[in-house]
Swiss-Prot record:
This is Pituitary adenylate cyclase-activating polypeptide. The modification Lysine amide is found at K169. Its main location: secreted. One of its GO terms (cellular component) is neuron projection. It comes from Bos taurus.
Amino acid sequence: MTMCSGARLALLVYGILMHSSVYGSPAASGLRFPGIRPENEVYDEDGNPQQDFYDSESLGVGSPASALRDAYALYYPAEERDVAHGILNKAYRKVLDQPSARRSPADAHGQGLGWDPGGSADDDSEPLSKRHSDGIFTDSYSRYRKQMAVKKYLAAVLGKRYKQRVKNKGRRIPYL
């Protein structure tokens, strides 16, 4: 197995995930879901039946798969997609062709200072992977903040019930 820098590995994983999310999704491949008919119909607050979103008949609007393809073609023309795929393939080949060698601590220290012992000077995968990892951190942190806000809200709303649970810990009393 080849040893590679974290930035190149992150770029490789990012490329694989993006490729599989775009080309591996059922909507992108044009698959249609069968009409799922539950035994009991679902009604909204006014008593009107809810629409079955998995129906195969359309309402005069294109299918989600065609809308996704149209949006993808609109925002990413074929030339730009080819360039992006070429860049990804080049980075992927570079990672796969890298010789397997154990790096010394001095090499890792030099790399931290911006010095790449075996790489080229025009390697710009570092900023891309840094931006990607920053985005992952931001997403994770915002998800954590949302979870904490929900917990705080539920503690405020269900505070009385929560206190009852703690108070009656050994006894089984239905609360809900």
